[in-house]
Amino acid sequence: MGGCDPMDEAARGALDLLGRIGGELGVLGVGTGRTVMRFLREASARGVEPGVAVPSSFETAVELAGLGWSVGDPRVYRGVNVYVDGADEAEPGRGYMVKGGGGALLGEKILSSRSKLNIFIVGEDRLVGRLGEKTPVPVEVEPGFVSMVLASLEELGLNPRVRTSPGKRGPVVSDWGGVIVDLLTGPLEDPRGLESMLRNVPGVRETGLFLGLADYIVVGLSSCGYRVLGPYRGRAV
């Protein structure tokens, strides 16, 4: 029985959405992972000329250069026009998300907080009733104090686990030098409460809770097509 790749459908939907709202890419902020690469390839297929893109990670910078984009230095730009990224989980009602599966949550959080328009693209399998249902909540922590930060997180009952990778020994370290720790929280009743709690833990640099940052979430469907969730921040198509 035939069907469609939800991520390809979501990438097409994001470009359609930009066309409907009259969004100019301008300086583009780009998340990390295969999802945003599909968006960029779809843009190229539609004849969108590569411009300046500010990456959230070194991995993204390499991909952008390979696709002909001018890679903007995040140390120079004060903000971006449009930010495009995927998500590990998305709560449709409020547009809340968990991100950081690729370990780039710090760069992704900064870029999305300094963007005029944020569009997140996901497959329908990423939708959840409550954040934490399917994936852990990642945090980036200071590398020199990992054990102490872990102790603080354990005392809060957050079930932390230092992320490891089969490609290397030791913990996963972000491009910004922080250690990635996954919190096995289970479904969250109060994501904002957890965000506030984590920000009061010394040594936590950033969290993978993306709350109040989405303008639109484009959901790709395996049955073909997509649906647009939002606007979440007062915009309208």
Swiss-Prot record:
It catalyses: aldehydo-D-ribose 5-phosphate = D-ribulose 5-phosphate. CDD domains: RPI_A. Keywords: Isomerase. It holds the Pfam family Rib_5-P_isom_A. The keyword Transmembrane helix does not apply. It is an enzyme of class 5 (isomerase). GO terms for cellular component: cytosol. Pathway: Carbohydrate degradation; pentose phosphate pathway; D-ribose 5-phosphate from D-ribulose 5-phosphate (non-oxidative stage): step 1/1. The active site is at 108 (proton acceptor). Substrate binds at residues 32-35, 85-88, 99-102, 126. One of its GO terms (biological process) is pentose-phosphate shunt, non-oxidative branch. Its EC number is 5.3.1.6. Disulfide bonds: none annotated. Signal peptide: none annotated. The keyword Isomerase applies. InterPro entries: NagB/RpiA_transferase-like, Ribose5P_isomerase_typA_subgr, Ribose5P_isomerase_type_A. Catalyzes the reversible conversion of ribose-5-phosphate to ribulose 5-phosphate. Belongs to the ribose 5-phosphate isomerase family. Homodimer. This is Ribose-5-phosphate isomerase A.
